[in-house]
Amino acid sequence: MNKGLIGIVVGGGPAPGINGVISSAAIEAINHGRKVVGIVGGFKPLLEGDTKSVLPLTIDLVSRLHTTGGSILRTSRDAPGEVKKHFKTLMATLKKIGITDLITIGGEGTLFMAKWIEQEARGTINVVHAPKTIDNDIPLPGGFSTFGYQTARHVGVEIVKNIMEDSRTMGRWYFITTMGRYTGHLALGIGKAAGATITLIPEEFSEKRLSFKKAADILTGSIIKRLSMGRDHGVAIIAEGIAEKFDMEELAKYEDIEID
């Protein structure tokens, strides 16, 4: 197969380390005699047939990129319906740009996109995916975490430690919700490292639908146990995936609860 351009595209939400991946991938490719371009704006311009949102990546441009935050190529979140509707346009745009090798940087959704592109290309485009997500919900060989997770965990730990001091000083409880989508990796990582009083993650509950009362009883029990020990304060870490498991019919019975 004729070696055309290597393309790099970022999908999904932001996470620490994106520019470092762009930089290292581009430098390695250039040192092997390849030309590299970045797609500015994630998959959105590709889905719209835009061939102008292309940034040539040179060593001068990316050599210090790893020291900066964010993404030089920006990113986008694309609805599954729009992706399916305009997927043929995306494939045609990649071909027009001249990309024969594609590096996708993103989480679970971008991983599926990479798979679809590889299947649709039928050997005309090689695809490599760099797993990026603070959720750490992509299983990797050797138990490695996805990039972005460790930094998010570290930052979260520092925040929780400060809140724990407020909790102790004020004699009150704080409930903290962490990101993580359907998984509790980030919540558990932060909770363990910070020494939070209690951490609730969805993996602890085998039932498909979690009773709101059950979750509330667990948190209430933790508060009561602390009081029996003479401690009137604490910090609970709650993974956002817990809310995904709640029975909405049960929640409707609690009129005073604001449902986000």
Regions found by a protein language model. Name each.
Residues 1, 46-102, 110, 134, ...:
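Glycine-rich oxoanion-binding loops at beta->alpha junctions
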Residues 5-13, 18, 96-109, 175-176:
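A short, small-residue-rich loop immediately preceding and capping a beta-strand
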Residues 11-13, 34, 39-45, 77-78, ...:
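Short, ordered loop/turn segments at secondary-structure junctions
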